[in-house]
């Protein structure tokens, strides 16, 4: 919605991501893509970094997302965000498509990549994924889809789970301390990104 784009452009955020994936129903995908392209071109984003989360690799929409974004947006577009990445093969394909469209549409600014790890396979393959393209600028973790890929029940996105914790070592009157159920996955992503 236009008012949300305007609100984002006037915020104190330094990076804005516009969504074509989870927040958009299947029947509204093309309309949303058109609105995002218009927003990138028409709104004064000031010095903000602009990223667009495209549809996932396993859909027929991703190539059209990439093509239209690179054909129809100004150099104001900085990054493409790729959800549910599970292998380096996917990143190779993204790089191949983006490189071809940058050349075809004579884009002068190289587009960077943001990679979202949202599956168990993605976490297992994270080292190869991180090294798959020189365009990779950041790694993200999607806890809800990751939980779904595990078949785990999650009652909240972000924050703590009241049923996940540790007990202190005191044998009597042991106290329960909340823990982050995604700490291990997050730390692996941080280590990989840092390396």
Predicted segments with their positions:
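Expand to "…catalyze enediolate/carbanion chemistry for C-C bond making/breaking, isomerization
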Residues: 1-195
């Amino acid at each position: 919605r236009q008012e949300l784009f305007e609100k984002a452009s006037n915020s104190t955020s330094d990076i804005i991501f516009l969504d074509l994936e989870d927040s958009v129903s299947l029947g509204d995908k093309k309309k949303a893509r058109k609105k995002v392209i218009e927003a990138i071109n028409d709104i004064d984003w000031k010095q903000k970094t602009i990223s667009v989360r495209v549809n996932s690799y396993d859909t027929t929409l991703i190539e059209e997302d990439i093509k239209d974004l690179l054909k129809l947006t100004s150099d104001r577009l900085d990054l493409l965000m790729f959800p549910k990445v599970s292998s380096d093969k996917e990143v190779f394909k993204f790089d191949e498509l983006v490189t071809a469209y940058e050349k075809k549409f004579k884009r002068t600014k190289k587009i960077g990549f943001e990679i979202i790890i949202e599956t168990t396979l993605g976490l297992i393959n994270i080292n190869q994924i991180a090294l798959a393209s020189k365009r990779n600028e950041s790694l993200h973790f999607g806890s809800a889809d990751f939980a779904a890929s595990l078949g785990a029940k999650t009652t909240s996105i972000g924050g703590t789970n009241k049923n996940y914790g540790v007990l202190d070592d005191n044998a009597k009157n042991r106290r329960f301390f909340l823990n982050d159920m995604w700490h291990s996955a997050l730390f692996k992503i941080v280590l990989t990104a840092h390396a």
